[in-house]
């Protein structure tokens, strides 16, 4: 489903074709002020490298906060952060809540099932009412691609919007925390070969990661998966496409595994989960094809025995749990940059 200009739901084709890599509602760069400062974080696509690096540098400063006895800084004291999750989430919602709390913000988690949207109220009417409650920052997850853009366009001028995942389009904070994780372990993006493996067609994380990797100068990004799960337009982005996992993994420095997003699939795109694992699952034997010091990442939720073997997920080259830890600092950085200096 997608959101029309009234905030109601409709046909996803109205916003974008799922087979295309780029989305049609991206006009200009509504994330930036006239001075080039970050007002909203809606997508990594179109962000200058300087802003991406600024977010990563700021996150590095916040990592140390988690090691303190008092895990708080006053950057968002007096600010109100509303978490608006129209889709279910565990890691993203929890880490945003922790991040906002550590910035000393007041945090409200909207119960969507009990809200007026479940009674037929339009998305924009909900947003306008919440803006009238003097919200400063909306963190939005929505099943419709483009919903955070709609909210950013129509919310009160003092309100900032962070996209916590919209349909198949983007998950910018996941992309940023993935970049922070890669930088932490590999330092220099300009010498890396990065493989993204699995259901790329339905993955907003893959889109955000690809935009971030190319923005930061990674010379070789590989997309590996079945033909039925690869979107069009990857080659035009400079991405190398592989339909054979063993070939695609040879010599890579970073492996980002993706789950099968069965909830977004229509029709039978794949055989059984067991058959998928035989062909596309990351096992210790396949991991050995990568560089000896390669790291393994996964945005979660992880399906063991489908896209990844437990020996790999729990092995010494896995940095999956560290991604979650770094995610708090990255989301602190994004909220601090977007809303910390606003009036």
Swiss-Prot record:
Q: Which InterPro entries match?
A: Asp/Orn_carbamoyltranf_P-bd (IPR006132), Asp/Orn_carbamoylTrfase (IPR006130), Asp/Orn_carbamoylTrfase_sf (IPR036901), Asp_carbamoyltransf (IPR002082), Asp_carbamoyltransf_Asp/Orn-bd (IPR006131)
Q: Which Pfam families match?
A: OTCace, OTCace_N
Protein name as catalogued: Aspartate carbamoyltransferase catalytic subunit
Gene Ontology annotations for the cellular component aspect, listed alphabetically? cytosol
Q: Name one GO biological process term.
A: 'de novo' UMP biosynthetic process
The reply on keyword Transferase is yes
SUPFAM superfamilies referenced in this protein's UniProt entry, alphabetically: Aspartate/ornithine carbamoyltransferase (SSF53671)
Instruction: Name the keywords, alphabetized.
Output: Pyrimidine biosynthesis, Transferase
What is its quaternary makeup? Heterododecamer (2C3:3R2) of six catalytic PyrB chains organized as two trimers (C3), and six regulatory PyrI chains organized as three dimers (R2).
What catalytic activity does the UniProt entry give for this protein? carbamoyl phosphate + L-aspartate = N-carbamoyl-L-aspartate + phosphate + H(+)
The pathway to which it is assigned is: Pyrimidine metabolism; UMP biosynthesis via de novo pathway; (S)-dihydroorotate from bicarbonate: step 2/3
Could you state a single Gene Ontology molecular function term?
aspartate carbamoyltransferase activity
